[in-house]
From Swiss-Prot:
Transmembrane segments: none annotated. Belongs to the ATPase epsilon chain family. This is ATP synthase epsilon chain. GO terms for molecular function: ATP binding; proton-transporting ATP synthase activity, rotational mechanism.
Amino acid sequence: MNTIHLEIVTPEGLIFSNDAKMVVLPGSEGEFGVLPGHASLVSLLKIGVVDIENVDGTHDAVAIDWGYVKIDENKVIVLVDGAVYVAGNSESEIAQSIENAKTLVKRMSDGNGILATALARIENAARAR
């Protein structure tokens, strides 16, 4: 099976690193998906949620603020100022990561539309777990 390697990096360090079937990113001009073999490009990212379709078909989510993405045929590197991986081994850990993600998005958002969209994506990602 073809996969693409995704890394999400902040000034604090590596937030996420794994192979995926597909990655959906919040580009400055709208969301876009990346599959293995994608054309190389560099793009600006806005506040939102990176949706990751894992090799086993499950989905992960990482809330991000602004940054950049560099895409090659088999690798996606996301460089952002802040990110929160929405995950956990218990309900309380997942709830805490959701709150952290909401705080990140609210801190960086300057528009109610962007805020509402990002918060809805975070909630949906958490429900899918």
